[in-house]
Amino acid sequence: MKFLAVLLAAGMLAFLGAVICIIASVPLAASPARALPGGTDNASAASAAGGSGPQRSLSALHSAGGSAGPSVLPGEPAASVFPPPPVPLLSRFLCTPLAAACPSGAEQGDAAGERAELLLLQSTAEQLRQTALQQEARIRADRDTIRELTGKLGRCESGLPRGLQDAGPRRDTMADGAWDSPALLLELEDAVRALRDRIERIEQELPARGNLSSAPAPAMPTALHSKMDELECQLLAKVLALEKERAALSHGSHQQRQEVEKELNALQGRVAELEHGSSAYSPPDAFKVSIPIRNNYMYARVRKALPELYAFTACMCVRSRSGGSGQGTPFSYSVPGQANEIVLLEAGLEPMELLINDKVAQLPLSLKDSNWHHICISWTTRDGLWSAYQDGELRGSGENLAAWHPIKPHGILILGQEQDTLGGRFDATQAFVGDIAQFNLWDHALTPAQVLGMANCTGPLMGNVLPWEDKLVEAFGGAKKAAFDVCKGRAKA
């Protein structure tokens, strides 16, 4: 509404300026009538007998008017006759047009006067324009003043007791006036003046009200603001304390959960030892897991949970019995929210692939000859570097495989099946058929010499994250565990 009032006021000022300019231009249009010399009389208007047509008609009119006076008789001298009294002529009040091609000194003087008058009018119009701009700036300033005073009035009234606040609508404000009124500037000034008076009255009443009360004056705006600031600081401190407490509880619960999981793993190992007494195999890693046919229910599960890994090396001995139809999935590791956290898979006629967080790298490995092979896969999160070894030889390497993605902890490691969900939903077409032994997992990348020593049985190593032990591997669905010495078995092959 204030913006509309400013627009209307500006339009009214422009309209008044246009009217003043029109009024001021009227003397300029009437100036040719004043071009005639002020001292001219009837004699100069009718002096020449051989003038133009309009002048002849005026002379005739003059002669007709003069015939009413006394005439001079013939034969009498002209000097003896008194001149007749002057008779007012109608031509004195007629607008006699002058010829267009009649140069005279009076016209040149009048042209100079007209130019001066035109310059005067132009300066007057410029002054009116400047006045309009000043009035518009004043309207803007008054609008800002009204906004500031209204805010100050609200703050002051908020500090008054409820009995001092006006219950009804306030008068002498901009809401009572018509925004399209010609007296908009006066209304603005009145509104500003009324707001000033009201603020002064309220500021005077607040100390008086505080002095009349025996208790401390909490109605002062400064006291209210300070109280609100104090409460806000207390609330903020409480919120920060609660946030710290929640963070501490979350951290403590995470540590507690890890400790509980460690204890559970230890208890599971203890229970397995108690159930089986000592290991059925000597040494404990001298066994294999056999999956005789392709299906979706035979598999082996590792009981130990994995920690978060930023690098790993997984090594195993495998013998595929699937022929040339694809080797399936020797192992898969899934976590909550990601079924393909780590997968070693060969599906159909495709080459063997390593999947990490659903990112794929093709490995130049071949296991289709139904013989025992030692394979190792190493990977690091830095730049996603990976390497693939078969029988102690480096077959391929690459980078940008799930770079900077750490392997998530607390997942499920399955031998022989590919997981579509956490710990289940196996697909028979992706199942492994054959034997698996010596599956070990490290939390770092092994050197080529270490890989070669394990492959030729000259430097056997056990995984520091997951060793191949009888008590940590459990067979399900018809998969069988049997005693097996990998070095002797490979020598026989």
Swiss-Prot record:
Region Disordered, annotated ranges: 37-72
GO CC entries: glutamatergic synapse; plasma membrane
Bilayer topology term: Single-pass type II membrane protein
Pfam families hit by this protein: Pentaxin
Location(s), subcellular: Membrane
Cofactor: Ca(2+)
Keywords from the named record: Calcium, Disulfide bond, Glycoprotein, Membrane, Metal-binding, Receptor, Signal-anchor, Transmembrane, Transmembrane helix, Ubl conjugation
Post-translational modification: Ubiquitinated by a cullin-RING-based BCR (BTB-CUL3-RBX1) E3 ubiquitin-protein ligase complex containing KLHL2.
GO molecular function: metal ion binding; protein phosphatase binding
Disulfide bonds: C315-C376
Chain ranges on the Cytoplasmic side, renumbered to this chain: 1-2
Binding-site residues for Ca(2+) 1, renumbered to this chain: N340, E418, Q419, D420
Transmembrane feature ranges: 3-23
GO biological process terms held by the UniProt record: neuron projection development; neurotransmitter receptor localization to postsynaptic specialization membrane; regulation of postsynaptic specialization assembly
SMART domains: PTX
Known glycosylation sites: N42, N211, N456
Protein role: May be involved in mediating uptake of synaptic material during synapse remodeling or in mediating the synaptic clustering of AMPA glutamate receptors at a subset of excitatory synapses.
Protein name: Neuronal pentraxin receptor
